[in-house]
Amino acid sequence: MTTMTVPPSLLPLEPFPTAPDTRASTPHIRLHGLGKRYPGGVQALREIDLEIRRGEVFGIIGRSGAGKSSLIRTLNRLERPSEGQVLIDGEDIGGYDGQRLVALRRRIGMIFQHFNLMSAKTVRQNIALPLRVAGVPRARIEERVAGLLQLVGLEEKRDAYPAQLSGGQKQRVGIARALVHQPQILLCDEATSALDPESTQAILALLRDINRRLGLTIVLITHEMAVIREICDRVVVLECGRIVEQGEVWEVFGDPRHAVTRSLLGSLRAALPADLQARLRQAPGGGDPVLLDLQYTGASRRVPDLLAIARAIGQRVDLLHGGIERIQGRALGRLLLQVGAPPGELPGVLAKAALVADKVEVLGHVAHA
């Protein structure tokens, strides 16, 4: 990954208050009993309890209508909760209004799916706009904007208009604009959904670099598990306004417990190929080999060792399908093995297979082609 040097002009316009030592162990963001109800009785969020650590990249995923946007918009009070609390650095923001609310929103930047750039203003002018509104002196605005252009890699596009930019470049402008007030938290509302795959990867890499270099806490919502896998430290899964699963990314990917999570992960997991599915039988017939599913959840930090698998099972083993990926330093995935074991020896084979995988499942017997 490219090493990024933070420009000197990215020093805060105004120094942030020094946090007391007791805040080092305090969640940066804490939600307690959070609920959101819209007119007409629509309950968008229900009993949300959540803690987000300082400096982490935290993902919120769910299907359309799950409550993702409602949740993220309560963090900067674009939406007022109907019940419960939102605490930033241990302080309930529910009663904020006027200047306190303005100050809060300057500490919390936000980027959006559709960029929200002003078409008649240049890149430089779009980035500078929040500072002009805040009455920052022109010289400091120019210095700050120059540093942000360097940070997001748009120095050569400073005088371009949004219509002259690609989708990825527009989102870089959005990121720069969100950082003008030196926020401590960055909210990302489907920030890559309108981008092509190459631009998505570039924006995610930029966000991760910004997280590491500036120490930002990043909270992002998405419906794409690939985005969670690429950038997040932890994730929650929402369904019908409730949290149905949460944990470290490797935990949720390696051993999803809820049906919604498994559905969202479907396209990323090694599914049983159609030709094998057609030949699969639950009852053995005429010496048909058994199909074993060796699963690696990351819990044991075990790495698939094909030689050890063959030795442990002690039978003829064919690797028919599978996939292993590394997430947060752990090997996750599955191997589908065809094992020529007689029915009487199957219990022993399963016991041995359990020594070399986190989970073992018999999928059936493979009929001869």
Curated annotation (Swiss-Prot):
<dbReference type="Pfam" id="PF00005">
    <property type="entry name" value="ABC_tran"/>
</dbReference>
<dbReference type="GO" id="GO:0005524">
    <property type="term" value="F:ATP binding"/>
</dbReference>
<dbReference type="Pfam" id="PF09383">
    <property type="entry name" value="NIL"/>
</dbReference>
<keyword id="KW-0472">Membrane</keyword>
<dbReference type="InterPro" id="IPR050086">
    <property type="entry name" value="MetN_ABC_transporter-like"/>
</dbReference>
<dbReference type="InterPro" id="IPR027417">
    <property type="entry name" value="P-loop_NTPase"/>
</dbReference>
<dbReference type="InterPro" id="IPR003439">
    <property type="entry name" value="ABC_transporter-like_ATP-bd"/>
</dbReference>
<dbReference type="InterPro" id="IPR045865">
    <property type="entry name" value="ACT-like_dom_sf"/>
</dbReference>
<comment type="similarity">
    <text>Belongs to the ABC transporter superfamily. Methionine importer (TC 3.A.1.24) family.</text>
</comment>
<feature type="binding site">
    <location>
        <begin position="62"/>
        <end position="69"/>
    </location>
    <ligand>
        <name>ATP</name>
    </ligand>
</feature>
<feature type="domain" description="ABC transporter">
    <location>
        <begin position="29"/>
        <end position="265"/>
    </location>
</feature>
<keyword id="KW-0813">Transport</keyword>
<keyword id="KW-0029">Amino-acid transport</keyword>
<dbReference type="GO" id="GO:0033232">
    <property type="term" value="F:ABC-type D-methionine transporter activity"/>
</dbReference>
<dbReference type="InterPro" id="IPR017871">
    <property type="entry name" value="ABC_transporter-like_CS"/>
</dbReference>
<comment type="subunit">
    <text>The complex is composed of two ATP-binding proteins (MetN), two transmembrane proteins (MetI) and a solute-binding protein (MetQ).</text>
</comment>
<dbReference type="InterPro" id="IPR003593">
    <property type="entry name" value="AAA+_ATPase"/>
</dbReference>
<dbReference type="GO" id="GO:0016887">
    <property type="term" value="F:ATP hydrolysis activity"/>
</dbReference>
<keyword id="KW-0547">Nucleotide-binding</keyword>
<keyword id="KW-1278">Translocase</keyword>
<keyword id="KW-1003">Cell membrane</keyword>
<protein>
    <recommendedName>
        <fullName>Methionine import ATP-binding protein MetN 1</fullName>
        <ecNumber>7.4.2.11</ecNumber>
    </recommendedName>
</protein>
<feature type="region of interest" description="Disordered">
    <location>
        <begin position="1"/>
        <end position="26"/>
    </location>
</feature>
<dbReference type="GO" id="GO:0005886">
    <property type="term" value="C:plasma membrane"/>
</dbReference>
<dbReference type="InterPro" id="IPR018449">
    <property type="entry name" value="NIL_domain"/>
</dbReference>
<keyword id="KW-0067">ATP-binding</keyword>
<keyword id="KW-0997">Cell inner membrane</keyword>
<comment type="function">
    <text>Part of the ABC transporter complex MetNIQ involved in methionine import. Responsible for energy coupling to the transport system.</text>
</comment>
<dbReference type="InterPro" id="IPR041701">
    <property type="entry name" value="MetN_ABC"/>
</dbReference>
